Amino acid sequence: MRRAILTAAFALGICGHLRAHDVSTTPITWNREISRIFYDRCLSCHRPGGSSFSLVNYTDVQPRAVEIRDAVLSRRMPPWGAVKGFGDFRNDQALTPEQLELITDWVQDDTPKGNNPRMLPKMPTFGAQAPAAVPASAVRVAGTVTLTSQFMLDGLLPEHAADGVQIVAALPNGSVSPLLWLYGYSDKYRHEFLLRKPLVLPAGTIIRGVKPPASVLLLPAPSRGTH
């Protein structure tokens, strides 16, 4: 009887050992997951002919993998330059928590490339980009500004950014709307912050938080044609 129990226990141990090693996880690879993040978030700047070094191919990225991981975890890259949750922007290029986790795990697993190049996404194309024209009705804010008429706000464009600037709109009804909190922003990567939805700022709204010599443009929402 004792021998039978020992035999059964040994068999269970073997089965448990085999099951532990039978569990397989699919590795995160450049071809399947990581390239998609880079193509979507990085190549507007990091490509041949772009404003910074190329991150198009695995051979470009792999030697810099640890440096890239540290840069994205610290939110230095992509250079979005604003605190998430302070304002809501439709062109937010900051990486999601899921994307950050994928990059972190990929680097921890020694940056596998993957065996199937057909998993790579289609390479995005980029044409020549002229600086966006600033609408004549944009409002420049340097210091505290009180709006004399209603303004339909579509976004903000820092002209001379000061890190840490927190821009708010104090409405006549006493409420305060957070607009933009610059953090790690660089004029080298000057860009618009476009609101998820246009925001109506009534006459009498006070825009605060921009201390000279910093200045920010309030961008008007496109006017809708009448039908």
What residue spans do the PLM features occupy?
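Bacterial N-terminal signal peptides
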Residues: 7-15
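Bacterial N-terminal signal peptides that target proteins for export
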Residues: 1-6
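His-enriched metal-coordination microenvironments in redox/metal-binding proteins
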Residues: 133-201, 208-227
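Aromatic- and Gly/Pro-enriched helix-to-coil junctions and flexible linker segments
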Residues: 18-143, 208-226
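Short linear sequence elements within intrinsically disordered, low-complexity coil regions
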Residues: 15, 35, 43, 94, ...
